[in-house]
């Protein structure tokens, strides 16, 4: 028993050492480029799947093994780690950092909640719409971490009252008391502590528990007091921090007034994770999965100019919209029942006392933000401007602004995002007051030299691990192509040629949907993209017909807490159990799979010309064989 425990403690080290040694006969006994490339690919994939080393570190394996085995030169491998998509991500993160710093996302979220009211059905729809909207532009993890504190505050208001009469009798007392997490109370609730931007606590540093599949297991989200109380700040600079009791105390102390209250908490919590996933599908920059697909596709088929921000949005927006509505019905039916008339009524006469109190609390939180600030207006303007420039660069149906330049093809979506992101480092955060003196303010503050975002803000938000991970995927794909491994894999799949194209795509989608529940999304798509490209070329199927649905289905890792970080964040709040996630997530998975398959076979065909085998795929196939 002691030996077994010792092996379990060092299992990661054993994997790191034993896997390369056990696979070493492959390139030694078969000294070919294909075998050497397969060796590197398998070692890297095992490291990714097992989490024996961090995902970013495992992505560096091709950087030294490819040159060592003579698959690619060192400078060729290095070039794969920084691509056009990396610059696109840099620019987007600059805008995202500004949104998070000045709490523009919170203003949008609270405003939408105020519009919906406190009826469970409308509240569910509102939070799902809000999360989807934010997740289009911010990472799914960041969006979930931003919205969940607001959801938790609303939930605690909904479950803290015993009944209407009790709330009515003690309304003055309840309004005077702050929401706290005093363990002595019979009903623990959420405490919102606002910490200024200089606080060192952030989601990354707090997710320090043992990782499962690259997803941190959160047992105690952000729990930091303001260390800089002497510095006065605009309310929009404050960040909502959440204190939750430990899982054991949650089990003992969290009580729901009724089964209905418990179902509301489960429903709202899970819906945040699902709607973040749905929103991430909508834009090409919504998830790292889409970015990896875009860069791999552009590298594999450089002559194909069919996928950009505009075309992806035109295809995916109807999918997200339909998924959002159907998922709302599914979650409502599963947890709240079919009484839509009662739970979705907007009539003020039908609102209970505690629903009115909840709305009042949300109104108070919104009023704390004050009037919209100058940095918020600048950030919102840049946000809208970036989206408009992306859409109008090459809309497809009319000439875009890129056609005004003499040289074509030099500008991409990354050009726009990096330019606007660069400007955010220059524009002052304080509105210029020309010809006016700011008496009573210190000289540094009155000069207004602090920009909208600083490099420190950018560093806190930039996901460098994803950048290296994506680069490792490009390196693997490049090695597979140059060594001929992709062609060999494609030839082994000729047995699938008897199946119709839609069946091949469906099987691929089901396969990745299962794998991605246990393997991280970036690792899954990085492994499958080269294989599916070879499969499509071998079967003479338009590669987009397979790649786009698979890319979307990889994002549907919604059944387990380890599926993706949003699931882990939601699960950490303690409202739902794994069986709840599996039951609800299975329905969302099926909904997404059906809608994606319908979309790719209807408007996807006309948008991407999927009914023909394109010339750019033939050119790539000839190049691989050569």
Curated annotation (Swiss-Prot):
GO terms for cellular component: plasma membrane. GO terms for molecular function: sodium:sulfate symporter activity; transmembrane transporter activity. The chain crosses the membrane at residues 13-33, 52-72, 77-97, 113-133, 274-294, 309-329, 372-392, 414-434, 466-486, 499-519, 543-563, 590-610. Residues 217-228 have a biased composition (Polar residues). It is found in: Membrane. Transport is inhibited by thiosulfate, phosphate, molybdate, selenate and tungstate. Not inhibited by oxalate, citrate, succinate, phenol red or 4,4'-diisothiocyanostilbene-2,2'-disulfonic acid (DIDS). Its main location: membrane. It catalyses: sulfate(out) + 3 Na(+)(out) = sulfate(in) + 3 Na(+)(in). GO terms for biological process: sulfate transmembrane transport; transmembrane transport. Keywords: Ion transport, Membrane, Sodium, Sodium transport, Symport, Transmembrane, Transmembrane helix, Transport. The keyword Amino-acid biosynthesis does not apply. Highly expressed in placenta and testis with intermediate levels in brain and lower levels in heart, thymus and liver. Belongs to the SLC13A/DASS transporter (TC 2.A.47) family. NADC subfamily. This is Solute carrier family 13 member 4. The gene is SLC13A4.
């Amino acid at each position: 028993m002691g030996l077994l425990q010792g092996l379990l403690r060092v299992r990661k080290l054993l994997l790191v050492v034993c896997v390369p040694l056990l696979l070493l006969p492959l390139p030694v006994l078969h000294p070919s480029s294909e075998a050497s490339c397969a060796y590197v690919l398998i070692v890297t994939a095992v490291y990714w799947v097992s989490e024996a080393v961090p995902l970013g570190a495992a992505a560096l394996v091709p950087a030294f093994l490819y040159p060592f085995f003579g698959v690619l030169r060192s400078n060729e491998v290095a070039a794969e780690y920084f691509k056009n998509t990396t610059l696109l991500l840099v620019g987007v993160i600059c805008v995202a950092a500004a949104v998070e710093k000045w709490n523009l996302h919170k203003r949008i979220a609270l405003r939408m909640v105020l519009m919906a009211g406190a009826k469970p059905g409308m509240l569910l729809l509102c939070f799902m719409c809000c999360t989807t909207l934010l997740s289009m532009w911010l990472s799914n993890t960041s969006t979930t971490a931003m919205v969940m504190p607001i959801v938790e505050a609303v939930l605690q208001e909904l479950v803290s009252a015993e009944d209407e009469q009790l709330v009515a009798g003690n309304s003055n007392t309840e309004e005077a008391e702050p929401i706290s997490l005093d363990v002595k109370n019979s009903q623990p609730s959420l405490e919102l502590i606002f910490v200024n931007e200089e606080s060192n606590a952030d989601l990354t540093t707090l997710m320090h528990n043992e990782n499962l599949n690259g997803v941190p297991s959160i047992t105690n989200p952000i729990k930091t007091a303001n260390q800089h109380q002497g510095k006065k700040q605009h309310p929009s600079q404050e960040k909502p921090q959440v204190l939750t009791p430990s899982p054991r105390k949650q089990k003992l102390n969290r009580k729901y007034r009724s089964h209905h209250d418990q179902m509301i908490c489960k429903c709202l919590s899970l819906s945040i994770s699902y709607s973040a996933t749905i929103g991430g599908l909508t834009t090409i920059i919504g998830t790292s999965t889409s970015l990896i697909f875009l860069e791999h596709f552009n590298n594999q088929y450089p002559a194909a100019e069919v996928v950009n921000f505009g075309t992806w949005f035109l295809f995916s927006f109807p999918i997200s919209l339909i998924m959002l509505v159907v998922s709302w019905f599914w979650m409502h039916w599963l947890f709240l029942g079919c009484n839509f008339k009662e739970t979705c009524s907007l009539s003020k006469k039908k609102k209970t006392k505690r629903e009115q109190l909840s709305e009042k609390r949300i109104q108070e939180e919104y009023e704390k933000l004050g009037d919209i600030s100058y940095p918020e207006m600048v950030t919102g303007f840049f946000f809208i401007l970036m989206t408009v420039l992306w859409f109008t660069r090459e809309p497809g149906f009319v000439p875009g602004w890129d056609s005004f330049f003499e040289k074509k093809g030099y500008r991409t979506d990354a050009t726009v995002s990096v330019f606007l992101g660069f400007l955010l480092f220059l524009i002052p955060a304080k509105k210029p007051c020309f010809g006016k003196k700011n008496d009573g303010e210190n000289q540094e503050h009155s000069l207004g030299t602090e920009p909208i975002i600083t490099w420190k803000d950018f560093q806190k938000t930039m996901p460098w691990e994803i950048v290296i991970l994506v680069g490792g995927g490009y390196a693997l794909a490049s090695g597979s192509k140059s060594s001929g491994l992709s062609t060999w894999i494609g030839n082994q799949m000729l047995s699938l040629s008897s199946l119709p194209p839609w069946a091949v795509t469906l099987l691929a989608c089901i396969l990745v949907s299962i794998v991605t529940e246990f393997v991280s999304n970036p690792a899954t798509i990085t492994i499958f993209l080269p294989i599916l490209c070879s499969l499509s070329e071998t079967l003479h199927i338009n590669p987009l017909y397979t790649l786009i649905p698979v890319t979307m289905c990889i994002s549907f890792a919604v059944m387990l807490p380890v599926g993706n970080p949003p699931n882990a964040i939601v699960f950490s709040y303690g409202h739902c159990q794994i069986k709840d996630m599996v039951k609800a997530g299975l329905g969302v998975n099926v909904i997404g799979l059906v809608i994606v398959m319908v979309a790719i076979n209807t408007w996807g065909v006309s948008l991407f010309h999927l009914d023909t085998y394109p010339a750019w795929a033939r050119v790539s196939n000839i190049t691989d064989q050569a």
